[in-house]
């Protein structure tokens, strides 16, 4: 008779509960009530969901990171850099390969053939475009970097790609791959219930479905540069400037969270025998 239930995931010894780090709102009004924000999770329009970010969970990978924000949960693993095949022509720069898979239980629609849908391939292409400018490819000639992303729970495509961008960049840094800077992903939406000058940062699936336009961005806050930008729908230039300014401001806080997670993981590795 089995003494343990194999259907349940047994956490390793020394495991600790998740500690969520709240990202403060960038709103100048400190006495505003969250109950009147109008959002389904009571956040203010310019406030993102609290995130949990933990590097180094996949021991077999060169670098990895798990991220959780609301109903969005995913894990990234980096393998490499490693030499390319002998039959491959010489390339003075490294090659980045990105593969995204959705778990069968990641959304309300069951996926019978994981990895074969166009949603995963589109997300992988977007991740590739967002991360490639941040990697110093010239230092890794004739080599390849394999990045694997598994979506455990999805709360909308744009939220997935934003969280995956941040987690993947942390995984690359944890793998020891030289970067120009950490890449942070963010998304925003223009909702009819809010003025155009108050975009909803980090919208949920429900909020995104009711929005007139959707905006996602990947940027390196340390350098103040944008690596990828995607806009769906129509938005006036004034509102677009507001979205860019708020995303840049919030990304600095998220950059601090990612940096702190890497530092804590490095200190933990140094203490291990």
Where are these regions (language model features)?
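Polyanion-binding surfaces on beta-sheet-dominated domains and ring/shell assemblies
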Residues: 1-273
């Amino acid at each position: 008779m089995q003494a343990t239930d194999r259907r349940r995931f047994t956490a390793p010894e020394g495991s600790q509960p998740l500690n969520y780090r709240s990202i403060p709102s960038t709103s100048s009004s400190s006495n505003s009530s969250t109950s009147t924000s109008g959002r389904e999770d009571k956040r203010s329009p310019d406030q993102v969901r609290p995130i949990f970010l933990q590097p180094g969970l996949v021991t077999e990978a060169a670098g990895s990171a798990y991220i959780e924000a609301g109903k969005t949960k995913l894990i990234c693993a980096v393998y490499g850099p490693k030499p390319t095949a002998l039959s491959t022509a010489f390339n003075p720069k490294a090659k980045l390969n990105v593969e995204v898979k959705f778990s069968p239980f990641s959304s309300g629609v069951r996926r019978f053939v994981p990895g074969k849908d166009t949603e995963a391939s589109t997300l992988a292409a977007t991740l590739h475009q967002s991360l490639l400018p941040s990697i110093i490819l010239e230092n890794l000639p004739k080599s390849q970097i394999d990045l694997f992303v598994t979506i455990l729970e999805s709360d909308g495509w744009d939220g997935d790609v934003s969280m995956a961008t941040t987690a993947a960049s942390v995984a690359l840094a944890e793998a020891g791959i030289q970067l120009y800077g950490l890449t942070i992903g963010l998304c925003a939406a223009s909702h009819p219930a809010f003025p155009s000058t108050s975009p909803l940062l980090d919208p949920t699936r429900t909020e995104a479905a009711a929005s007139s336009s959707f905006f996602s961005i990947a940027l390196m806050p340390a350098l103040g540069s944008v690596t990828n930008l995607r806009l769906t729908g129509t938005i006036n230039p004034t509102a677009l400037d507001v979205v860019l300014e708020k995303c840049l401001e919030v990304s600095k806080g998220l950059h601090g969270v990612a940096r702190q997670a890497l530092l804590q993981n490095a200190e933990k590795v140094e203490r291990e025998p």
